[in-house]
Design a protein with these regions (language model features):
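Active-site phosphate-binding/coordination module
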Residues: 17-24, 70, 133, 143, ...
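Conserved active-site and cofactor/substrate-binding residues in soluble primary-metabolism enzymes
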Residues: 16, 68, 155
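Active-site neighborhood of HAD-like aspartate-dependent phosphohydrolases
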Residues: 1-52
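C-terminal cap/substrate-recognition subdomain and adjoining C-terminal extension
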Residues: 1, 75, 82-211
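Metal-dependent phosphoesterase signature
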Residues: 54-92
Length: 212
């Protein structure tokens, strides 16, 4: 069964779910709006330039959920996905997912966003399997820290390799869709790489364009 791999942010949805979630947290009053959005914007500029230390971004973006229960976060995420993310799902992405589903491919979203966001958005898209940044829990509460290898740049490849070994899968005939230069390590590994809404750094690479 060939794999169909998908980045999430700016590939399947219009925008970055972590940025959108940050704005949503300001609505909830979990963070001070002006300072938080200013710092988030600065960090995302580094991401766009390929210079972001993902650990720094995750430490910043997860601080507001530290000390909260997974159930509390899940309730907020459910509303967030329904109101904020769902209108941003690309119609072409839904059709692309369905084409791969009908072809019998195994669908997997692999994203550098937090697992509690990616899994919820994946369910909205009808994709149950995701690899994303895992968040540490202790005594029934989120700590605000990450756990394990981050699914970012080469980390996506390492996490995927571990998943392939666990699932008894290979990348033979695999397809991967992404918008970002940060996914070049994984784009270079699959048989059928496709760029979607590519950032400027991807435009100079000989990778197939796809309309997702």
């Amino acid at each position: 069964m060939p794999l169909a791999l998908f980045d999430l942010d700016d590939t399947l949805i219009d925008g970055d779910c972590a940025t959108l979630w940050g704005r949503y947290m300001t609505e909830l009053g979990w963070v001070e709006k002006t300072a938080f959005l200013h710092q988030e914007r600065r960090l995302m500029e580094l991401y766009a330039e390929g210079r972001l230390a993902m650990e720094d971004y995750m430490d910043f973006s997860l601080a507001p959920i530290a000390g909260r229960t997974p159930a509390e976060i899940a309730g907020a995420v459910e509303d967030f996905v329904a109101r904020i993310v769902a209108p941003r799902i690309h119609a072409d992405a839904v059709r692309c997912l369905e084409r791969h589903r009908q072809a019998g491919d195994r669908l997997l979203i692999i994203s550098a966003s937090a697992h509690f966001l990616v899994s919820a958005i994946g369910r909205r898209l009808g994709v149950d399997e995701v690899l994303a940044i895992d968040i540490e829990e202790r005594d029934g509460l989120y700590t605000g820290r990450t756990r394990g290898t981050l699914t970012y740049r080469e980390g996506k490849v390492r996490r995927l390799d571990a998943w392939l070994a666990q699932e008894g899968e290979t990348l033979a005939g695999a397809t991967f869709y992404s918008d970002s230069r940060n996914d070049l390590p994984l784009l270079s590994r699959v048989d059928r790489p496709h760029t979607v809404n590519p950032d400027p750094a991807l435009l100079g690479h000989e990778i197939g364009r796809a309309h997702v």
